[in-house]
Swiss-Prot record:
It is found in: Cytoplasm. The keyword Nucleus does not apply. This is Nucleoside diphosphate kinase. Its cofactor is Mg(2+). Major role in the synthesis of nucleoside triphosphates other than ATP. The ATP gamma phosphate is transferred to the NDP beta phosphate via a ping-pong mechanism, using a phosphorylated active-site intermediate. GO terms for cellular component: cytoplasm. The lineage of its organism: Bacteria, Pseudomonadati, Pseudomonadota, Gammaproteobacteria, Alteromonadales.
């Protein structure tokens, strides 16, 4: 098994509903370790930069507006096959299709406000972690 890092966002809808602790509990219960975490309120420029790959998609404006509508939690998670493990915990992008017991099934309202984001690959995780965290901010567990 490979120890990986992945990037995670708890989106404005879930932060506003005080689900941060419950979501962190899901990560830790699944064996993922939080090695960096902070709350940020994205500027339009930050949101547009983070989601630049979607800039030509019709939903881009609404996505940026949503992601700047309130604070978010960003975190780096570490564990065995962390990218896949985290995505399984999140559930399907559309909460109506998410398996029972997943974060999106339990905490999301709609496909547009779906509670959380997770990297889709190790390469994406590396890019996304670097967007929000310096190397010095990452604190691998030593015990």
């Amino acid at each position: 098994m490979a120890i990986e890092r992945t990037f995670s966002i708890i989106k404005p809808d879930a932060v506003a509903k005080n689900h941060i602790g419950a979501i962190y509990n899901r990560f830790e219960t699944a064996g993922l370790k939080i090695i960096a975490s902070k709350m940020v309120h994205l500027s339009q420029e930050q949101a547009e930069g983070f989601y630049a790959e979607h800039s030509e998609r019709p939903f881009f404006g609404a996505l940026v507006a949503f992601m700047t509508s309130g604070p978010i939690m960003v975190q780096t998670l570490e564990g065995e096959n962390a990218v896949l493990a985290h995505r399984e915990i999140l559930g399907a992008t559309n909460p109506a299709e998410a398996a029972e017991g997943t974060i999106r099934a339990d905490f999301a309202e709609s496909i547009d406000e779906n509670a959380a984001h997770g990297s889709d690959s190790v390469a994406s995780a590396e890019r996304e972690v670097a967007y929000f965290f310096s190397t010095e901010e990452l604190c691998p567990r030593t015990r």
